[in-house]
Amino acid sequence: MTHYEGDLRPAGARFVIVCSRWNARITDALVAGACRTLVDNGVSDDAVDVVRVPGAWEIPIVANLLAQVGQHAAIIALGCVVRGDTRHYEHVADLCAEGMMSVQMQTGVPVLNGVLAVECIKDAEMRAGGSHGNKGAETALAALEMVSLLEKLP
């Protein structure tokens, strides 16, 4: 039996972070965590691109274009959608996730979902460097591992 598992040091890989500008205080912290994690794991600064989009709704179309171009081994999607008084939150969060899944299934380029879907801004703060860690950093770790794993699979 052969066991496959990714590690955190894919050689020569380029990464792109696609991040929404909405809730910038939160998303800036997520981007910082992701960048720090990539660099801490041997990815050079010049092998990381950051693309800012208006909101989470726009992440899938940009991820799709980037995946088709093929310059990046993985796409790290970051954003923050906060529940409001209407169902808009559900549509944005759900369809953003579906769009990202569609991109990775159609292109074979991993699209890691670090888009927070939270009840309130306090929940987001806890996940952007607070008591629940930094989900941007965690998403970057998953990207590193997936790139390595996909390189190893037959």
Curated annotation (Swiss-Prot):
One of its GO terms (cellular component) is cytosol. GO terms for biological process: riboflavin biosynthetic process. Keywords: Riboflavin biosynthesis, Transferase. It catalyses: (2S)-2-hydroxy-3-oxobutyl phosphate + 5-amino-6-(D-ribitylamino)uracil = 6,7-dimethyl-8-(1-D-ribityl)lumazine + phosphate + 2 H2O + H(+). The keyword Membrane does not apply. Gene3D superfamilies: Lumazine/riboflavin synthase. The active site is at H88. Pathway: Cofactor biosynthesis; riboflavin biosynthesis; riboflavin from 2-hydroxy-3-oxobutyl phosphate and 5-amino-6-(D-ribitylamino)uracil: step 1/2. 5-amino-6-(D-ribitylamino)uracil binds at W22, A56, W57, E58, C80, V81, V82, N113. GO terms for molecular function: 6,7-dimethyl-8-ribityllumazine synthase activity. Its EC number is 2.5.1.78. Belongs to the DMRL synthase family. Forms an icosahedral capsid composed of 60 subunits, arranged as a dodecamer of pentamers. Catalyzes the formation of 6,7-dimethyl-8-ribityllumazine by condensation of 5-amino-6-(D-ribitylamino)uracil with 3,4-dihydroxy-2-butanone 4-phosphate. This is the penultimate step in the biosynthesis of riboflavin. This is 6,7-dimethyl-8-ribityllumazine synthase.
